[in-house]
Amino acid sequence: MSRQKTNRQAFGSVRQLPSGRWQARYPDPAGRPMNAPATFPTKREAQDHIAGVRADRMRGTYRDHRAGLQPFGPYAAEWVANGGTRGRLAAKTQALYEDLLAGPLAGLHDRALSAITPADVRAWYTRTRKTLQKAVKNRPGATGEARLRQAYSLLRTILNAAVKDRLISENPCQIEGAGQVNDPERPYLSPEHLAAIVGAMPEKWHLPIRVAFGAHLRVGELEALQRGDYSNGAVRVERQRIYVRGQGIITPTKTGEARTVVLPPSIAAEVEAHLASTTGFPKSPMFPRRDGEAITGNALSHAWRKAARGIGLGQFHVHDLRHAGLTLAAQAGGTTRELMARAGHRTARAALIYQHAAEERNAVLAERMDLVGAVRVESVRGADRMLR
């Protein structure tokens, strides 16, 4: 059987331009004629380009270079409006992304996706860092780095989506280390330090803080607790209060899943006494203000900072309550799965952090035990020598 040679020009055509360069033409996916994205110095290179396009079409890997002419701004806005990579964004996250697009990323809105190069991204990154540093220069401790990290991370994520949509061939966000969170590990809030801070706070905050510690609550989850969430020594954590552009709204928990956390008996007894001595409906706030509305995380944080700084423990934040409670649970022998259930974590990674902290704390305790034991042994030996 004779084999017919494939004519690669049957798929397209080439012609020489007055400049001497060669132009390649071939049908687009809809069958309409289109030009290659660039011209070629030789006829052979133009023919090879046509052959490559044809092969990509057959493999299903073809990318129409014209698709990348879409401006970044409209593409990014549509990506956010459609829920990002997973098709759903939390209200707070969507508001953050919209603010970043309107702020640090505004200068890229009119740029075609395919026209954004790694050099462009580096120039934008340097320029934006200077702008953000200038904007926060009068705010003590502020650097603008967190905002820059958020903006770069969003830009990289959106351009990754453009790669998957075959609008661009590769992601131009290639700055090493940019967009990564490098927050230092928070200091360990010991029960002794916690007791000291709570003791320096007004009494109205004592029980809310102990509940947050014992149930490993996020501040927003503490705000959203209702009287009916407590039953038989445990609290049901179903919701949180978040703030979007200053407006507080109630949403499901951060992971979208509810959890039941058994409180330490001493704290459970305090909650029962609190509920028995106050009135309200099951959906009333567990910890209300004088006007009947729920306490706010802002007021709690303010009271905490004032008390902590007043006794020389300003390094601790109210958000350290959750970390401290989970670390203590790990020290008490909690397994990874048990810590995940109590904290509401989806993956084991976060739970392992608390177990690691517990291991470090256990090592400190062991060293102290060894030291105390050595002192006692020497005392016994000394007494024994005296008897002799």
Q: What is each stretch, according to the model?
A:
Residues M1-T39:
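Short, Arg/Lys-rich segments that mark the N-terminal edge of DNA/RNA- and chromatin-recognition modules
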Residues Q4, A115, R122-W124, K130, ...:
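Flexible interdomain linker/hinge and immediately adjacent N-terminus
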Residues K43, Q180, R241, T336, ...:
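Catalytic-site neighborhood detector that most strongly recognizes the C-terminal catalytic loop/helix
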Residues G52-Y62, G73-G141, I158-N160:
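Basic/aromatic-enriched alpha-helical hairpins
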Residues N160-P172, E192, A212-R241, R337:
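Short, charged phosphate-coordinating catalytic segments
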